[in-house]
A protein has these predicted regions:
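Non-catalytic alpha/beta scaffold blocks inside enzyme catalytic domains
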Residues: 347-613, 665-672
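Short, glycine-/polar-rich solvent-exposed loops and beta-turns at beta-strand/coil boundaries
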Residues: 38-47, 69, 182
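N-terminal export/assembly segments and adjacent metallocofactor-ligating motifs
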Residues: 2-27, 35, 39, 55-58, ...
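Acidic, glycine-enriched active-site microenvironments
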Residues: 51, 66
């Protein structure tokens, strides 16, 4: 039965869900209500009082619109719809009073505050406040707290909205922040002066409506109006979080989240947010050719000529790295297969079936987790592999979902049923008749750590059997942003990585820095950073990073998304697709496209669903043939969240965070 209620907001009658709060109803009616503490993804605190409205026929004082539901309003004496006024003299006076209280102890140091220009307090003081103040006493001051290397604190600016406290406890799942004291003595602090132990902590910077919490790495580097803003996609994990990259000149200055309810909501991980300093360190900005055992700078003509000479008439293998766009992977496939070679993207050894999209991707969407009543994790630690997805699993747990884990025990920020450590536990539950689960919304999530061992195909088959027996949605949680798109483009070889490089005389390494290539083959490395792959190379071709070229990326649920260029590659580095196009001409096998748009058209002709941007194609369920796995314990794919790719390894901030995380594990706080 519908619970729709009629309500009049500023002379406009609307029909809304009775469970809505007044502030949500006003938004439905197109009326903007100022707020500081209210946030639609956090619990309601009702402590800033900026959202006051007048309820006609209700209490004689203004009501907090964030805390009152539409169903609580009384109709008129003859059954008329309740009336709410958001701009009456009573409301204006109330807002002026609240704003005056807000500014009593605020230092008003906007010229030196990093929040200046994008500050809610500035905007609302201008729109709803008075031009002066009656307060003449001394302002209070509060000691700053040390939250770690990411979040800078100026707690005298704090207005006690408690958004940061609610985010850390409700979304991030840590209890290190809280509010102490009352009235003028109230302050936000951390438990025993601990630094924050969460890989989502940077989101409190966005949530803070004032300049109390700001970014330490970004401090005093730019003003918002000086920055060029580009909407693009993150590649630090396979979730495909929507981000905004802000640049000044040729440099990336900061990375912020964009809202996408189906992917990352409005959160991003700390690696996504703070990895930008790695974009300008250890960069490859000129081609290199190895001469007499040493890498020497070369021109593009010399480097491409050396590669073409090495490849002609030889057995060539191509490797697709974790941060490569789908167009670049497809271009490499066309180039290498045109020379009679093979291409492989499963560089971690994952036993994913190239011909079965339901097997290497699954059938679940990220949003399916929201409504799940039971979630079974197999060989995955989502807190390390996809922190934003883990926050969504935590939200499902808060809403009553039961979580199960097959794998080593880990702190996932929520309670779970530990089914077992090893493959035998998976085989056991896959063979059971779990009757009640068939009538529930259930999701089975398997991680890359479970699929990279020799029996990965058998583990996958058991997980798919479990999903089939329980009528669950199935999700393969990838860790590489490029993996799904490359598999869609057909960058797979029979026998996987070993089959691709077996007997290869030339290995063309497109950004695969996690692979150890044995001595013997001639190695060409095309990538953005001087990392492991470049050290082994005989020729280095400097390419663009993910912020420096357009490209398609397909996330772990199969959603194609378009990344846009926010900056330009340094020095003589080129876009990856352009390098491969130039090399094809050098080989005398010129590809039939000479622009990225032409390349993308060819890709979409071969793989039509990649043209449906931001749409998740439905996969036909096809269970892999059942096999018996070994008996060893399942391992996790990510050992160090902060150092999983060459950009992160080049980042000073990520190195510091990695060291802090290791120190915490080595010396946990004693219980007292």
């Amino acid at each position: 039965m519908s619970d729709l209620k009629r309500i009049v907001i500023d002379d406009t009658e609307v029909e809304v869900d009775g469970a809505m709060t007044l502030i949500q109803a006003c938004e439905e009616a197109g009326v903007e209500i100022p707020r500081f503490c209210y946030h639609e993804r956090l619990s309601i605190a009702g402590n800033c009082r900026m959202c006051l409205v007048e309820v006609v026929g209700g209490p004689p004082k203004p009501a907090a619109s964030c805390a009152m539901q539409v169903r609580d309003l009384r109709p008129g004496p003859e059954g008329q719809a309740p009336v709410v006024k958001t701009n009456s003299p009573m409301v204006k006076k109330a807002r002026e009073g609240v704003m005056e209280f807000m500014l009593i102890n605020h230092p008003l140091d906007c010229p030196i505050c990093d929040q200046g220009g994008e500050c809610d307090l500035q905007d609302q003081a201008m729109a709803y406040g008075l031009s002066g103040t009656r307060f003449s006493e001394a302002k209070r001051a509060v000691d700053d707290i040390n939250l770690g290397p990411l979040v800078s604190t100026q707690m005298t600016r704090c207005i006690s909205c408690t958004r940061c406290v609610r985010f850390t406890s409700e979304v991030a799942g840590i209890t290190q922040m809280g509010q102490t004291g009352r009235g003028e003595d109230a302050e936000i602090t951390s438990y025993l002066n601990q630094t924050l132990d969460s890989n989502l902590q940077g989101n409190i910077i966005d949530l803070c409506p004032v300049g109390a919490l700001t970014s330490k790495p970004y401090a005093f580097t730019a003003r918002p109006w000086e920055l060029t803003k580009t909407e693009t996609i993150d590649v630090m994990d396979a979730l495909g979080s929507n981000i905004r990259v802000d640049t000044k000149g040729r440099e990336v200055k900061r990375i912020l989240p964009r809202n996408h309810d189906g992917v990352n909501e409005e959160w991003i991980s700390d690696k996504t947010r703070f990895v930008w300093d790695g974009l300008r360190r250890q960069r490859l900005d000129t081609p290199f050719v190895r001469v007499d055992g040493k890498l020497r700078p070369a021109t593009w003509g010399e480097a491409l000529g050396a590669v073409a000479t090495a490849m002609k008439g030889k057995k060539v293998a191509g490797l697709v790295g974790d941060l490569v766009s789908t167009e670049a992977a497809y271009a490499l496939k066309q180039l290498i297969e045109g020379q009679g070679g093979s291409v492989e993207c499963r560089t971690d050894g994952a036993k994913l079936p190239g011909a079965n999209r339901a097997g290497y991707l699954g059938t679940a969407t990220i949003e399916d987790i929201d409504n799940a009543q039971m979630i079974q994790l197999i060989g995955t630690n989502p807190r390390e592999e996809a922190p934003v997805l883990n926050a969504r699993i935590r939200k499902a747990w808060i809403n009553g979902a039961t979580i199960g884990l097959v794998g080593e025990p880990a702190d996932l920020t929520y309670d779970y049923v530990h089914v077992g450590n090893d493959r035998a536990a998976l085989v056991e539950i896959a063979a059971k008749d779990i009757g009640p689960a068939k009538d529930m919304n259930t999701v089975v999530i398997i991680g890359m750590g479970a699929l990279t061992e020799a029996d990965g195909a058998a583990v996958l088959s058991q997980a798919m059997k479990l999903a089939e027996n329980t009528k669950s949605k199935f999700m393969v949680l990838h860790t590489a942003a490029a993996r799904v798109g490359a598999m869609d483009a057909g960058c797979v070889t029979e026998g996987g990585l070993a089959g691709a490089i077996d007997g290869a005389e030339v290995v063309y390494n497109l950004g695969a820095d996690e692979v150890e290539i044995a001595d013997g083959p001639f190695v060409v490395y095309q990538g953005s950073h001087g990392d492991r792959g470049a050290h082994r190379a005989d020729v280095i071709l400097p390419g663009a990073a993910y912020t420096e070229e357009q490209g398609l990326f397909v996330n772990t649920e199969g959603r194609p998304q378009l990344a846009l260029r926010a900056a330009f590659p340094p020095g003589e580095a080129k876009e990856n697709w352009a390098i491969l196009r130039a090399l094809s001409a050098e080989l005398g096998a010129t590809q039939p496209w000479d622009t990225q748009a032409g390349l993308r058209r060819a890709l979409v002709e071969d793989v039509p669903h990649l043209g449906d941007i931001d749409q998740v194609a439905e996969n036909t369920w096809k269970r892999e043939p059942l096999k018996k796995p070994a008996k060893a314990s399942l391992r996790y794919a990510v050992n160090d969240f902060y150092l999983t790719n060459p950009i992160a390894r080049a980042s000073e901030v990520m190195a510091e965070l990695s060291a802090l995380a290791k120190a915490r594990k080595d010396a946990p706080m004693a219980a007292e």
